Every structure is written in C-alpha cells, then in structure tokens.
Amino acid sequence: MPLAFCGTENHSAAYRVDQGVLNNGCFVDALNVVPHVFLLFITFPILFIGWGSQSSKVHIHHSTWLHFPGHNLRWILTFILLFVLVCEIAEGILSDGVTESRHLHLYMPAGMAFMAAITSVVYYHNIETSNFPKLLIALLIYWTLAFITKTIKFVKFYDHAIGFSQLRFCLTGLLVILYGMLLLVEVNVIRVRRYIFFKTPREVKPPEDLQDLGVRFLQPFVNLLSKGTYWWMNAFIKTAHKKPIDLRAIAKLPIAMRALTNYQRLCVAFDAQARKDTQSPQGARAIWRALCHAFGRRLILSSTFRILADLLGFAGPLCIFGIVDHLGKENHVFQPKTQFLGVYFVSSQEFLGNAYVLAVLLFLALLLQRTFLQASYYVAIETGINLRGAIQTKIYNKIMHMSTSNLSMGEMTAGQICNLVAIDTNQLMWFFFLCPNLWTMPVQIIVGVILLYYILGVSALIGAAVIILLAPVQYFVATKLSQAQRTTLEHSNERLKQTNEMLRGMKLLKLYAWESIFCSRVEVTRRKEMTSLRAFAVYTSISIFMNTAIPIAAVLITFVGHVSFFKESDLSPSVAFASLSLFHILVTPLFLLSSVVRSTVKALVSVQKLSEFLSSAEIREEQCAPREPAPQGQAGKYQAVPLKVVNRKRPAREEVRDLLGPLQRLAPSMDGDADNFCVQIIGGFFTWTPDGIPTLSNITIRIPRGQLTMIVGQVGCGKSSLLLATLGEMQKVSGAVFWNSNLPDSEGEDPSSPERETAAGSDIRSRGPVAYASQKPWLLNATVEENITFESPFNKQRYKMVIEACSLQPDIDILPHGDQTQIGERGINLSGGQRQRISVARALYQQTNVVFLDDPFSALDVHLSDHLMQAGILELLRDDKRTVVLVTHKLQYLPHADWIIAMKDGTIQREGTLKDFQRSECQLFEHWKTLMNRQDQELEKETVMERKASEPSQGLPRAMSSRDGLLLDEEEEEEEAAESEEDDNLSSVLHQRAKIPWRACTKYLSSAGILLLSLLVFSQLLKHMVLVAIDYWLAKWTDSALVLSPAARNCSLSQECDLDQSVYAMVFTLLCSLGIVLCLVTSVTVEWTGLKVAKRLHRSLLNRIILAPMRFFETTPLGSILNRFSSDCNTIDQHIPSTLECLSRSTLLCVSALTVISYVTPVFLVALLPLAVVCYFIQKYFRVASRDLQQLDDTTQLPLVSHFAETVEGLTTIRAFRYEARFQQKLLEYTDSNNIASLFLTAANRWLEVCMEYIGACVVLIAAATSISNSLHRELSAGLVGLGLTYALMVSNYLNWMVRNLADMEIQLGAVKRIHALLKTEAESYEGLLAPSLIPKNWPDQGKIQIQNLSVRYDSSLKPVLKHVNTLISPGQKIGICGRTGSGKSSFSLAFFRMVDMFEGRIIIDGIDIAKLPLHTLRSRLSIILQDPVLFSGTIRFNLDPEKKCSDSTLWEALEIAQLKLVVKALPGGLDAIITEGGENFSQGQRQLFCLARAFVRKTSIFIMDEATASIDMATENILQKVVMTAFADRTVVTIAHRVHTILSADLVMVLKRGAILEFDKPETLLSQKDSVFASFVRADK
C-alpha cells in the first residue's frame, strides 16, 4: 500500500501551498514535529551522559528527596497529556484508514509528541532528584514551542471550518490547554527557585525526614507515578526475598506519621472542641468532631479517589456493550463524508464506535480505576493507622492520670483498657477504611441502575429490585452473624480464662488429681462455644451463599423476564453481557452494606467506650502551700501531695471542695522540728471507691526523715493501703498530707531534668520520686539488669552492691544469659522469691531520698531475709540517711526500726519508738516479744558469722526456681541453663521463614474426614463448572437473537421461534437453579469442614496438654501454651474456613476465566505464558514479604498491648518513681514500631493489587484484541466475544485475591502446624500395675511411710536432686524438713506424688509401693499445700471442694480451722461468694489460708505442707500451727519449713543438703548439739 508523510494521492489538497504554507495541513503537522524532535535531541545526551543521575551534595540513602514546585500538578498534566496523545494517535490511524494511501502526518506527530512527553517526565524526574534546576530550561523551551505550534494548528483548524463535530479539533484544543498549563508550571518553578533570570537562586533543603537514614517508608516522598503504582516497594520486596524483614529493615516512621505528631494534632482538635462544648468536652459527639477535625481531610481525599474509581468501573460494561454491539453489526466500516485539508477526520461517535478503540479505552480505564481504587484504600488505611496511634497515645496519657481505685475496683479494669487499646482502636481504624463506602455506595447503586435501565429498559428494574430488596436480608444475616460472633467471643474468653487458670494451677491440679474436673470444665465451655460457632457457621454460609447466588438470581429473573414480557426486543449479546457485568458491579456495594453498617455500629460503641474512659476519675494536683518559708516557723516547708481524685462525672465532695484553706491552717500547726520529718498525714480518711466506707480512718502519722520506719499489723489491717495513701493513690475523703519541700528528689539528679516531667507536661507534682517496691512484685518484660536499673544510669559499683545485698548473684549465675536474660511477662520465668528480690533490688538501686518497701520478706527464707535486712535496708539505705518506710510481718526486725507504726483495722493503733511501745503499750509489746523470741544482737551476729564460716564455699549457687517453685540442686544448673537456652531463649528471637506448609494443609484437611473432604472438593468443582455453563449458554442464547428473521432462523412460523427462545430460557433457568443450589452446598460444606476440624483439634490438644508431665509445663512457657488455645484455636475456628472458601473460589474463578478465554481465542495462550511467569514471581516475592510483615505487625502489637498491661499493673510504681514521661516515650516507640509495620504491610498489599490488576488489565486488552480480530474475520460469534471479555474482567478482579488469600492461608496454617507440634507431647503414665480392686478404699489409713534408697531426678537427661534417701516415718508423726535453697526439700515432697522421676528406690505407704498405683489414685489419697497460693475463679465452695463430695458443715469446719470462718460469713453468699481470677479480691495471706482450708477438707492420713505459711503474719501462723497439731493429731504431717521455729514442735526434724539427709532426729536432740546445722538455723531465725 502506498505510504508517504502527506499521502500519495495526486489530487490531495495536502500539497497545496498557494494560500500559504500555514494553510497547508501537512506542513502544519510537520511543524508540530519540530518541538518534539528538539526535546529528544537535547535531553537524550543529557540523560545518557548522566547529568540527571548525579546526586546532590546532601548524601542520603535514596534519590527522590526533593520536589520542585508544582510537582504533583506536572505529573497529573503529563498523564492527561499522554492520554490525549494516545487518543490523537488512534484518531489519526482511524482517519487515515478511510483512504487507500497512508498519511503519516495524521498520527506520526502525535507519536513523536507521545515519545517527547514520556521523555519530558523522565528528564524532569532525573533533574529533580539531582536538584539541578538549571537544566529545566530545556523543558521551558519545549513547552513554549509545543504551545505555539499546537496553537497555530488549532487556529488553522478553526479557519478551515473544522469544529467540534471532528474529534481532531477537540483533541487539538485540549493539547493547547495542556501545553499552556505545563508552560505555566515551568514558569512557576523559575519564580520560586529563581534558577535563571535572578541573581541569587533560592536553595531548597531536603525534607527533614530524609536526612534521617532510618526513614525508609518513602510513600510520602516519591513522585506521583511511584505513589500510584507503589514502584518504590519493588526494591523492598526484592530485598525481603533475600533476607528476613525485621524492625531494622523497616526502620522509622516519617515525622508526619509518628504517633506523637498525630497525638498533638488530635489534642489540638480536642482543645478546639472543648472550647466549643464546655458541657461534655470528652463526650462521644466531641470525640467524633475532634477525629473529623484532625483526620477528615485525608478521608475526603480517599472518598474522592473512591468515587472516581467507582465511576471508572462502569467503563468495563459500557466498553463490552460497545465492542460486542460493534461486532454484532453486519457492516463494520463507516463511510466517509467530507474531507478537510485533503483528509477525512472521524467524529467522536465514529471514534467510540470502533471496537479496537474501545478495547484500548477499556484497558486505560481499568488501569486508572485500579490506581484510584488502591490509592483510596491506601489513604484510608494510612489515616486509620495514624488515628489509631493518636488515640492509643491519648489513652496512655489518660492512664498516667487515672485514679488507682478506678483501675483496681472501679469502672475500668486492666482487661477493659487492653481491649480499648487492642480492639476498639482497631475498630475505629477499620471504620475509617470502610467509611468512604458510606457515600460512594449510593453513587454506585444509582449510576448502576441508570445504566441498566439504559441498556435493558424496564426489565432491568426487576433484577435491580431483587438485589435491593434482598439487601435487608443481607443486613439481617450480617446482624445475626455479628451477634453469633459476639456470643462466640464471650464463650471463648470464658474458655481462655478457665484454660489460663488450669495451666497456671496445673501443678496443684496434678497434685490433687483434679485434671479431669478442670478439663471437663473447659470442655463444657467449649461446647457452648461450639454451639455459637455453629450459629456463626450457619450465618456465614448464608452470607457466602447470598454473595454468590444473588447475582445469578438477578440475572435469571431479569433475562427470563426480558424475553417473556418484552418479546419484541431480543436479548442481544451486547445487552446480555453488559448487563451481566453491571449486575456484578451493582451487587458489590450491597454486599459491603452489611460490613459498613456493622463497622459503623462498632465504631459508635468504641467511641462511647472511649468517651467513658476519658471522662473517668483522675488524680489531680491540689493547690500547694508556697515553697518559701512561712512567717510562722518552718511550716511552709511542707506541701500537699496530689491526692485529690477528680471525677468528671460527679460533683466534688463537699468535704474536699476547697482544701487550700484547711491545708494552710494545718501546716503552721506542726511542730517546730518539722524538718526532721519526710511526710506527715493529719486526720486523714482514705477510701478506694468514691462512695465507699473509708479503708483508713483518722490517720495522723509522721514519718521521720532519714530514718527507718516500720509499719506492722495483722493481715488485712491496712498497712499497704497506708503506703498507697501516702503516695496519693487512694481517694482522700478528708484530712491533709504534707511532704517536706526541702527533701532532695534524688542524689545527683537535676530536679529540672525533663525526664522528671510527667506525661502531662505541665502537670508537675510537688512530691519527688519515691523508690517503691510493692507487695506483689511488679516486673517489666525485660532483662534482669533493666529491671534493677529501671532506666537509671548504670553504676557498676552500686549495681554489684545491690545484687549482693539482695543475694541475687547465685540466681543470676544460673540464668541462660546472666543478668541479660529476659525474665518474661510478669517475671514468669522466675520464682516468687526471685521476683520479690529483683523488685526490692530496683528500689535499692534507685538513688531517691525516699524508699517505700511493702512486705519485701514475704517470699524469702530466713537467710535471705536476714541478709537483705542487714546488707540492703540497714547498710545501703539507713546508713546512707535515706528515708525508708518498711511494711513487714517479720517482727524480729523491730529493734532496727527508728520509728514504728502499729496498725489495727484500718486505724493507727500507736506510733513511736520500740521503747515508747514498751512503756505505753505493754500488752502489745509483750505480744511482740513472744512472737519474736529474740536473743541479743551480739549472739545473732556471732551465729550468722558461724553459719557463713561453716559453708563449704561462700555464695553457693542456688538453682533457679520455676514459676511453680521447682527447686533444682546446683549440680544440674549448667545442664538446665543450657537446656533453657536451647528450648526457651527469650533473649534472641530466631526468625524462621518456612515455605508453604503443605504438610499442615494436609493435616488440616485430613482432620475433616474423607467424606466431608470429598464432598468439599466435588461440590466446588461442580459449582464452577455449572457457573461457566450458565455463561456459555447465555452466549449461545444471545447469539441466536442476532438472526433477525424467522426465515433466517430456519423457522417456518413465529411460534416455532418463540418455542426456540423458550427452550433457551428453560435450559438457562435450570442451569441457574442448579448453580444456586450448588452455591448453598459449597458454602455449607466449607463451614462444616472448618467446624469439624476445629472441634477435633481443640479436643485433641486439651486432652494431650492435661495429661502432659509437669516437666513439660516447667520447660514450656505458659504464654506459648496459652497461645495455642487462644490465637491459634481462634484462627482455626473462624479464619481458616473463610480463607479456604475465598481461596478456592478465587482460584477456581481465575482458572475458569482463563480456560474460557483460551477456548474463545486459543491464540491467547501464547500471551498467557509470559503473564503466568510474571504472576508466579510476583506471588512468590509477595508471599515472603507479606508473611514477614504480617508476623512483624503481630509481634509489634504484642509489646504495645503488653506495655499498656504492664503500665496498668505497675501504675503505682511508675507514678511513685515519677517515670511517667519515660514510659510514655516507650509507648511512642512501641506504637511507631507497630504502625510502621502496618504501613509497610498496607503498602505491600497495595503493591500486589496494583501489579496483579495491571496484569489483569493486560489480560483484558489481549483478550479483547484477539477476540475482536477473530470476530472481524468471522471466526467468532459476538456472544463468545462478550463471554470472553466478561471473564477477562473477572480475572482482573480475582487475580490479586487469589494471591492475597494464598498468603493469608500460608500464615494461618502456621496455627495448625504449631498445634500439631504440641500433639506430639508424651503423656504421663497414668496407668498403674495394681488393679483398682486390689487397692483398699480407705488407703492410706495409717500414714506409715517407708523410703528405701530413693533417688529422684526431674528428667532422664538431668542429674539426681535426691540421692539414696532412706527413712521411716511412723503413723501420726509430725516431721519437719529444713535446708538451704536447692537442698531438695520440695523435690522430697513431690516424690510422694510421683511428680518427679523416681529412677531408683521406692516409697512404700501403708504397705503399698506407690510406683505400682495409678497416678489418679495415688494423688487423690494424699494432701499437700504449696508455697504459692492458687485460687480459681468461682465460688468459695468450688475452690474448697470442686469434686462436690463434702457437706457444708465440713467446709465450714475447714474454714474455721484456717481462721477464715468469720471472713467468709461476712461475704454475701457465704460459701457461694465469688472468688475472682487468681483470688485477687483477697490478700496474699488470706489466699494462703484458703489453700490450707482446701487441704483440710480432703482429710487424708498424710498431709504435706510445703512452706505453706510464708505469706502469713507470725501471730496467725502460730495459731495455725497449734490448730494443725490438734486437728491432725492422728495423721502424718510433713512440714517443709520456711521459718524454722515452726517445726520446733515436730516429732522429728530432717535437714537436707544437696539431695541427701544431713541430720534426722528429734528437734530437742539436734538443738542440744551446738555444732548441728539445725541449731544454727534456729539461732539465725530468732
């Protein structure tokens, strides 16, 4: 065919120049080529030489660090320019196709312009990244020339009467506007940067974020193209495939996205709302307004992107309609009408009537639609993440000011706060993600219905009505689904609570043979949970069924109705497949409706919770007395502490309405020697609850400065409450508290240090920091060293002194990593005594002037207590003139006290020195003296020295105790430490990256059973085959409608043709009905499969764990086991079934679509291969990165929630130390770490979806082009073209979901893998050699114990802890066992219950070798009380007698023996009174007494007490000892002594050392031997 730039026709007007060259169209087109050629020739050398790639003087880790003015506008204009140029090229090709010869000038200039536009943006990007703006002069010239030449062309078109009816005229006008705007952008860069025409160019600094090498999240800084396509993630995804992603890889957040920045933005919004709404500044409405004020703009941007994406989504059906309609016509060639300038220009209608043009437009619309959609998702999620971080920071700041009483027994619990942080903030985040749907869904529905009506007419309203009318049903199902989920969550929480209790008390359960009771208790709750899960599965399957069946039903009703009621209008392929695509679009927002409504309701509830939390009571500063000395004496040196609790919901009490006056009146009334006192309380009444009875009444005390003050009293008299009241943690009803303002806050610490500030910033308290060690040790999940130093500067000498004073060095030596060992959450890897000593060590290490110690000796034996008292409290603190307040039951230390405060029933019984008590409180003093039974100080020091001298080696290492008090001897320390390091090394987390866990997948599916699995596979395959058959039949049916006349259809009568149509409709109806039924079958099958697997795996796991040996629980972290029952079971219960359904559906839909396209156009297979290779590598790289980022998102959320939990639990300690600001800084770090992981995960998901959807768009383009080509050559019907295009769009929609679901399934199958790993745990051997019939029912009835050559170890790989022990215990004897830590005392007691490996020797009880007994029989016939009290949530009756074997009288008798009868009678419900989880509503001593009562209930002939009275005061302990001796006079009692004096009345005393019996005789005999070890113990305990 002839080819020339201006054409080859001799008569062509293109060569005429008689009216001037500018009136020659070909010349004007040639003139338009000049600017483009100029740019290409100028820029290519610069790009290749490397001007644009040179880096700036500021060296940073990536290049895109600077944006010139108008950066985004330039990119937007360039994209529009490229689109218009593509249209111009296409228009030129179509216009040129009319004539025989080819006119290159119609499309070649546009092609050159397209190349130049791409070159311009590449050139600009390189100039921008190199920060060399002077080179932009080339673009300035180019835009000027292009604008001028294109303007000339536009004017000449107008002169030759070429107007809006010709598309070329419209495109030229748009190009003039675009070139002009780009020229203005370039001029604006000159104006701002002044790189030419000005003497002094304006320097621009790089963004502050990018000067920090740690900022690697580049989304805010890259150019617009990279932002839209997430191109910058390519390098990150590629790197992630080579090495694991960790926090160092994702580094820091940009400043604008950090929690502190967003928190400040939120605070500004809250302040603005507070000024507007003074009545309820923390109300729900005010919170919503503040959130919208702070984050609303980004939400509007996301909504704009979403609306644009939804509107562009309708391009697919419209283009399908146009393409199929064009191919369905007989004549595909339009006839030319009029020529202008020697050529013919097509109109817009002719342009849009071309199938190839529509295919290209469909491709571009899909690209743009997917880009806008992903941009909307990203902006919404980013906004939600920023909002979440801001709210979490605000919650934390509120916690720092909350009343302790409100946390401990008020409206807000620690669990509720953690839920607020972990759940409610996420609810708000996801609401912001779904929020744009609230206003985009109506737009999508309205436009969809209008287009359906335009294409189908009235019959379209039938199908639309079906979809819309079923929306309330969907909402109803979604509501029921939400209710079922909520009920499931309640039962799940109850089950986890019971499981947690069961695991924490596993040692007690095994010792008491209660495993089956608590296992049944968990199974009962699990059955309730499974009932809820079945309801959840039913509604989920209905929801899935409706999602898949409604489009089929709508299409069926619409099309059958169309041919039935509108017989004059046939169902053409263009109408059918365009309508089919529109129905799929229309269904989407209605599916989302239920999710959006649920999310909105949840967000409203969450904001209400947040409002209640933010409005809760706070501790606020009272007005303080002036710091200057008052005119009268030195009274002004005392200031009020911040004790006032402000409740924003209630008016302040009248008694504390104005405390400034009373305080100023009270302050001068102090004695003149006020400077000698640290703190003084006058007439104080304190309570825990706002309206409760005062816990402390009429408190008037003075704590001397620089001296040791001891607070003593019986259990529950208010000693700990007094400390907390002094620290300002209780609600003060009346009275005043004064702190000496001249007290230095700490030694060597600048009082103006910013670290001393509280989290509130401006709310600085007058009291200085107080080193506080609570009765219940509070530890961080950090190293031992970090817990002791507590973020204070490390002082090696002082650190060693503190370690020595607390006797921690032996314990540190056996830890896997010494003092760098992570101690676990709540110090779970340590024993009670170790936790207590680390807590005390923290208080000793701090250089504060005031130290409060709340019962630090409770979990320590006599030697540790004496050493701590002497080396720690006396030498480190008192001798250093620091004020020490010590709460204790150890009355033998009273002579060391400078000041004593005696409490009774919440009041001060007496305060003074010990001599004061001797003079004025003779009876009380004599009582103390009896309890103390002390000898003079010189003898005590002498015996201590003798004891130290008698030790074979000083500092003998003690074995590390487990959380249940397990004691190992020193010989196994090395081995145990090595094993601990190998099995549970919390100090270093090994990042393992596995491939797709196919084995776990096989185990999951095989757990469902062969029948259910077969049904699942068969129904899924059959369903998708039927769905393809429906659409294929529709193509055949609509193709038949293209034959216009009955004759052409080979029908003699019109009735026959109607019959033909009815056959098509009938078959279509049958196929659709079968498809709907199969949708129901598959949805039910997949959910029931998930239920069966969940039920089977949980039952297997529970049975395996409950039967596991105690060694398993001692070497496996409790949190790890609990996670299997919580998160992993939840994943299997609720997530895997839905993910499995989505994965199978999306995969089979993609396979079906590709199969149909390949069938329609086999040549598509050629293009499919490279696309498949690209998809494979994308999914391969994405899965690895997604798995790492998902795990990182989860692992960074755990420390965040744990930090909140730690803060709530240790709030008193944090506020006492004045460490609010430090902990808030940690919170910001944890929040930012979690947010950066979430943002990278979001960006990775967007990267995947953009890649896969762009590939999907390529599939659509290739499928469209090949289908059109085949159809034009009469090789393909229009119906099959429509079928192929519809399925091509389906690939575009489901390709990314397939990869996403595959990645999700890979992560979720990890739960199955972990559970199966636990199922391999070996169970204890519960079976015995003796048949139950051979064991007497009342065995053991005498209590005779024979121990013959007994050797015991904890594991076959470890060395013995008891060696060749031989002894005889006669019936009814009372045996006392003592020895140093690690001597084997507890191992001796555990041997009776076969809790340890008795590899040699035997124990014979009443003539029966216990090794031959079934474990349950043995353990149920003995009784033991452990050192650590264990109580379970439930009634007192359940805790005493879970087997329900005893009468009420027996239970009351046991309570009376344990000194608890009066306490329980005072409770509402008596024996049915509720004990909270862990017995938190009782004191430590009372919990231990309940455990004693529980043992008394069993009434066995052998009774073992393992340091059972450690947490009880001496008076109560003495009473109990007498009661035990009386109540168990005829029983054998083995007592392991914590306080040696408690076994002085025993018949025999056994002293153990290194697992062997050192001494065994009557206590009188051993005491008479001055060199006996027992005698030295007694002297030290006095």
Curated annotation (Swiss-Prot):
Coiled coil regions in record: none
PROSITE patterns: ABC_TM1F (PS50929), ABC_TRANSPORTER_1 (PS00211), ABC_TRANSPORTER_2 (PS50893)
Residues the record marks as carrying a glycan: N10, N1050
Cellular component aspect of the GO annotation: plasma membrane; protein-containing complex
Membrane topology: Multi-pass membrane protein
Activation/inhibition comment: KATP channels are regulated by cytoplasmic ATP/ADP ratios; ATP inhibits the channel by closing the pore, while ADP activates the channel. Activated by phosphatidylinositol 4,5-biphosphate (PtdIns(4,5)P2).
Listed Gene3D superfamilies: ABC transporter type 1, transmembrane domain (1.20.1560.10), P-loop containing nucleotide triphosphate hydrolases (3.40.50.300)
Location of the protein in the cell: Cell membrane
Record-level Gene Ontology MF annotations: ABC-type transporter activity; ATP binding; ATP hydrolysis activity; metal ion binding; potassium channel activity; sulfonylurea receptor activity
Binding of Mg(2+), residues: S720, Q775
Pfam families attached to this UniProt entry: ABC_membrane (PF00664), ABC_tran (PF00005)
Superkingdom to which the source organism belongs: Eukaryota
Transmembrane feature ranges: 31-47, 73-89, 107-123, 137-153, 170-186, 304-319, 357-372, 439-454, 461-473, 542-557, 577-592, 1014-1031, 1068-1084, 1144-1161, 1163-1175, 1250-1265, 1282-1297
Side Extracellular, residues: 1-30, 90-106, 154-169, 320-356, 455-460, 558-576, 1032-1067, 1162, 1266-1281
Residues noted as binding ADP in the record, renumbered to the chain: T1381, G1382, G1384, K1385, S1386, S1387
Domain ABC transmembrane type-1: 299-602, 1013-1307
Region (Disordered): 741-766, 939-962
Biased amino acid composition, Basic and acidic residues: 939-950
Record topological domains on the Cytoplasmic side: 48-72, 124-136, 187-303, 373-438, 474-541, 593-1013, 1085-1143, 1176-1249, 1298-1582
Ranges of residues in domain ABC transporter: 679-930, 1345-1579
Family per similarity comment: Belongs to the ABC transporter superfamily. ABCC family. Conjugate transporter (TC 3.A.1.208) subfamily.
Function: Regulator subunit of pancreatic ATP-sensitive potassium channel (KATP), playing a major role in the regulation of insulin release. In pancreatic cells, it forms KATP channels with KCNJ11; KCNJ11 forms the channel pore while ABCC8 is required for activation and regulation.
Quaternary structure and interacting proteins, as annotated: Forms an heterooctamer with KCNJ11; four ABCC8/SUR1 molecules interact with one KCNJ11 homotetramer.
Database matches in PANTHER family: ATP-BINDING CASSETTE SUB-FAMILY C, ATP-BINDING CASSETTE SUB-FAMILY C MEMBER 8
Protein name: ATP-binding cassette sub-family C member 8
Naturally occurring in which organism (per UniProt): Cricetus cricetus
